């Protein structure tokens, strides 16, 4: 199935589940300092652009965000700025160049309250489902 153009999606919802994956599932967030940088950049960009982050998780090789904005058209620019900022940081500290993420991020509109609640629960439970932090 082909993706809807982002403009069509943005017309339907102000809430989104966003998934960003490392290129070839590379562990681009493996270290704590990398996760901290991503979360701090996310908070800064969100505040600058009027985006509210309702839930997030940063795993070793991907991140999930649940976001909303009064003007949904700012969400793609928010993600572009966030991922570009992180990619530049990652490449600089790893002394490398090239792509960090697998293409553009994936986004899914959350059209009902039930979808939103289910998605936030999924995001919060993602580390447990992956066996992270279990003894």
Identify the role of each PLM range.
Residues 1-135:
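Short catalytic/metal-binding and nucleic-acid-binding patches
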């Amino acid at each position: 199935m082909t993706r809807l153009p982002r403009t069509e999606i943005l017309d339907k919802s102000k809430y989104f589940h966003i998934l960003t994956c490392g290129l070839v599932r590379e562990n681009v967030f493996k270290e704590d300092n990398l996760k901290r940088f991503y979360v701090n950049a996310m908070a800064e960009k969100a505040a600058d652009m009027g985006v509210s982050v309702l839930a997030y998780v940063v795993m070793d090789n991907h991140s999930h965000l649940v976001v909303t904005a009064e003007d949904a058209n700012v969400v793609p620019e928010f993600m572009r700025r966030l991922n570009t900022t992180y990619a530049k940081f990652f490449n600089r500290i790893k002394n490398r160049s090239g792509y960090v993420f697998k293409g553009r991020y994936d986004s899914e509109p959350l059209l009902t309250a039930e979808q939103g609640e289910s998605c936030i629960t999924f995001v919060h439970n993602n580390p447990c489902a992956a066996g992270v932090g279990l003894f």
